[in-house]
Amino acid sequence: AVGYTVSEEYIGEALKENPHSFYLATKSMARTYEAMKKDILGSLDRLKRSYIDLYQIHNLGEADYELVFSENGALRALKEAKEQGLIKEIGITSHSVSVLDKAIDTDEFATVQFPFNIVENQGEQVFRKAKAKGMGTIVMKPLAGGALKDARLALRYLTKLDFLDVLIPGMADEKEIKVNQSAVEDDSPLSEKELADIKYLKENMGDKFCRRCGYCMPCTVGINIPMQFLLEGYLKRYDLETWAVDRYKSSDKNASDCI
């Protein structure tokens, strides 16, 4: 994504010898025609490619929906880029079911992307609607933002759902790549133990997680709200108490400053 620091540069460098050997997707938070046009050209340059397979409108919310679809909106730039052969398909990502539901009805997009995992299934009807229209479905947050520690179980669960096409878990090292690859290549039915573990997670973890979408920002007193939840996760899920507490205390504003 354009906003993910140097990710496009790194991928471009890694694939420069054979840039079209992978199906590549990226995305932009641009909402206007000129801003999106600039981002598309920038992505092509950073990725060292003559075209991008899938270019997505990144995290579209209700506030910007009308602008994106307007004459001066980002969608126009994407459609022009597709006509010019600079991108092959146009997609949309969001943390809002209602936004994706409306976007699907426009028939402007090849793919939709939404959070979905063992404990968060609010997007099922959106994904089913998209599949019924021949669209591709992409799952973000398949591990619930790190809350699901058993990556193999989390991914195997998702591969058994016929309305999901692509899973995009984050991977930090080669070991995680191998675990994820093994999970999605295992086409055996879920075992009784796996089903029991899934049932336990559904019943005990709840379905409310911070996805760091930024909808809660800005805070009126300057608290970085997503960071508060991120540090909580490091404390409770990864047992990094000293690190998490130190980071929390060093913040300019934290939860104790909430009015």
PLM-predicted stretches and their roles:
Residues 22, 109-117, 188-194:
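Short hydrophobic/aromatic-enriched beta-strand-loop microsegments
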Residues 1-22:
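N-terminal binding-site loop/beta-alpha segment at the start of enzyme catalytic domains
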Residues 2, 6, 28-31, 94-98, ...:
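Short beta->alpha linker loops
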Residues 22-24, 90, 137, 167:
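Hydrophobic/aromatic residues located in beta-strands of well-ordered beta-sheets
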Residues 9, 34, 101-102, 175-178:
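Alpha-helical elements of the RecA-like P-loop NTPase motor core of helicases
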Residues 31-138, 143-146:
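Glycine/proline-rich, positively charged
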Residues 7-14, 39-43, 74-78, 99, ...:
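A general structural detector for well-ordered alpha-helical segments in enzyme core domains, enriched
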Residues 124-259:
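Structured C-terminal cap/extension of enzyme domains
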